[in-house]
């Protein structure tokens, strides 16, 4: 059995405690949480099922395919969190800011718009390709002396005592290993192995929808505008992306690449994945000329949409985090940003625990964390479901109500700042 502590590393000068954390799941949330802990001087080991690629600064600088990636909208609060740990300068060159947000419905009079000048903010957030975000986070983790990586490892068991939590995992060489620490944080996705091993149930709701994601090119520059469009074909979101070689935040290089998220009925996605012309023409029909002409699409992917909420997020010395705790509908782009706020709060609480000389796996403190995050989580979950229901329901009365609501939102000055702050993650 391996017990992970700062002593396991050659105790870097910024390590403030011999207590440590195991993070299962090395996606964007797991990688980010490890970096948040390291910034606080807390050591961690990240255990990931898949094998990581060997990357370095030279390989990292190579551009991914011009029209081939999934993307994430980073709220202003998420950007602030990355700024706090000194990582945003690395991320910013591959992120594209959102200066304006437009919401409308095809064939209806409802329309609303948010502008950064009106709200007196630098931007509402940033859009970044998942490939670049993952590479930058992984590179930062690999270079951090307080973070150890174990990849190609499948967790098979979780055990707890009064003072430690232990995971057992199988390696790619079919060798069984164990690892112990003061706390385990499970960031291993919607179908979380750790959550299931602990017997934590979930509340699931199948929306009967699929999300088609991809990157398109238009003949009109995006000008840093994000567009949410509700059409009979389903909700459509088009977000600005960096250009092929340029900096997406350079006003002189407003690009022509846009990220697309299209919510359609389950079963309809196959035809749009296979037929680029059909995909582009249907997008055009849904958007009109608001985004210009859609002239090219990259490889597209699709995944079914199901809301998954863990019955509890703390079990002994284990915290359930990220999509393992709450997998949400992507229509409002809030899922990853909610996870980042969770991670930021927990890292801060663990650091405070260390400064008091107390156990970072103390269940009472972890229960306090779960309670502290409930309000924000419930608000975001309700908002996502309200948008899905409100803008997909065919009832004429509901359609009229949502159009009136859009107009009211656009015309009432006191409401806009409130909604903008919620969307940016600055107010919960």
Regions found by a protein language model. Give the residues of each.
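C-terminal helical "tail/cap" subdomain of flavin- and related membrane-associated enzymes
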Residues: 6, 348-428
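Beta1/beta-strand and adjacent pyrophosphate-binding region of the FAD-binding site
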Residues: 14-27
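Conserved N-terminal helical subregion
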Residues: 16-18, 76-84, 89-197, 205-210
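Glycine-rich FAD pyrophosphate-binding loop
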Residues: 24, 38-68
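Conserved FAD/dinucleotide-binding core of flavoprotein oxidoreductases
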Residues: 113, 231-303
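FAD/FMN-dependent oxidoreductases across multiple families
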Residues: 270-355, 361
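N-terminal Rossmann-fold NAD(P) dinucleotide-binding loop
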Residues: 30-31
């Amino acid at each position: 059995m391996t017990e992970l502590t700062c002593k396991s590393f050659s105790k870097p000068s910024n390590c403030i405690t011999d207590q440590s954390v195991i993070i299962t799941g090395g996606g964007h949330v797991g990688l980010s949480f490890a970096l948040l802990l390291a910034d606080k001087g807390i050591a961690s080991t990240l255990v990931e099922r898949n094998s990581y690629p060997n990357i370095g600064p030279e390989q990292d600088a190579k551009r991914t395919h011009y029209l081939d990636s999934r993307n994430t909208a980073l709220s202003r609060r998420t950007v602030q969190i990355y700024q706090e740990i000194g990582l945003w300068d690395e991320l910013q060159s591959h992120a594209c800011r959102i200066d304006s947000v437009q919401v409308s419905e095809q064939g209806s009079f409802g329309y609303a718009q948010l502008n950064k000048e009106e709200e007196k903010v630098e931007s509402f957030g940033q859009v970044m390709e998942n490939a670049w975000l993952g590479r930058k986070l992984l590179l930062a983790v690999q270079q951090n002396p307080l973070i150890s990586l174990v990849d190609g490892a499948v967790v098979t068991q979780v055990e707890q005592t009064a003072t430690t939590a232990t995971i057992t995992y199988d390696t790619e060489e079919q060798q069984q290993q164990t690892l112990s620490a003061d706390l385990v944080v499970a960031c291993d996705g919607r179908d979380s192995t750790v959550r299931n091993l602990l017997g934590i149930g979930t509340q699931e709701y199948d929306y009967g929808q699929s999300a088609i994601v991809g990157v398109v090119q238009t003949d009109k520059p995006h000008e840093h505008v994000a567009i949410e469009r509700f059409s009979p074909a389903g909700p459509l979101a088009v977000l600005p992306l960096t250009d092929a070689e340029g900096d997406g935040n350079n006003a002189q290089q407003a690009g022509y690449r846009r990220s697309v998220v299209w919510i359609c009925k389950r079963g309809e996605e196959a035809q749009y994945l296979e037929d680029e012309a059909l995909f582009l023409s249907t997008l055009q029909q849904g958007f009109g000329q608001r985004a210009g002409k859609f002239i090219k699409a990259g490889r597209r992917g699709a995944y079914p949409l199901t809301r998954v909420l863990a019955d509890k997020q703390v079990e002994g010395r284990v915290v359930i985090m990220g999509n393992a705790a709450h997998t949400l509908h992507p229509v409002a782009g809030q899922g990853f940003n909610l996870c980042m706020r969770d991670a930021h709060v927990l890292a801060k609480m663990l650091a405070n625990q260390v400064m008091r000389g107390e156990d970072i796996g103390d269940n009472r403190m972890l229960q306090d964390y779960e309670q502290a995050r409930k309000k924000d989580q419930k608000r975001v979950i309700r908002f996502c479901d309200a948008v899905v229901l409100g803008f997909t329901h065919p009832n004429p009365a509901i359609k009229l109500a949502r159009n009136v609501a859009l107009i009211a939102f656009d015309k009432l000055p006191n409401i806009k700042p409130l909604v903008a702050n919620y969307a940016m993650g600055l107010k919960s």
